[in-house]
Amino acid sequence: MNKIFLLSLSTLIFVIGCAGSKPKPVTNKDLPEWYLNPPKFEDKFVGVGDALRPQFSLSKQVATERARVEVARAVETTVNSSLNDHMQASGIGMEAGATEFTESVSKSLVSTTLKGCTIEKTEIFKDRVFVMVTYDAKKAKEEAKVVARELAKKEESLYNEFKARQAFDSLDQAIDRMKGSSSVAKPE
């Protein structure tokens, strides 16, 4: 009787223990107010990020990096996408079978330099670090102008090099077309 009681009790404890291990859903009380609805500024880009890591410093670093990536996506994002659409039918008339396959793939790549991106807020909620960063829109415009000018100079330099090569090739061809004779009398 004691064995049955102990077995029943241990089974009951096991079932109760397993049933209570569901993760709690995240609620607004677990987040800073500004995380889901970041403030909007006319002259600044805003990005938010969060991280939950064993070490606080790593959490802060990862959350900050995620917030910066969000800003970088707002400043400059290159999106590559492809859509493959395949349709096939086999058989005769209304008895034909049809197969249709559609695949959509997209990838975004962010590569930009954020000079002057600053951390505005850092908060900790239940061991999770939340970070908000801002980036001055005027600085973003200036950086874009600098990059555009550098690209234009590089393209101009490449174009000038191309034109110089063309000129030398033209000169080489003109020399090759020259005849070997001259109107000057040859010395005997």
Which role fits each region the language model picked out?
Residues 1-19:
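Sec-dependent bacterial lipoprotein signal peptides
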Residues 18-188:
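Domain-level marker for long, solvent-exposed, non-transmembrane regions
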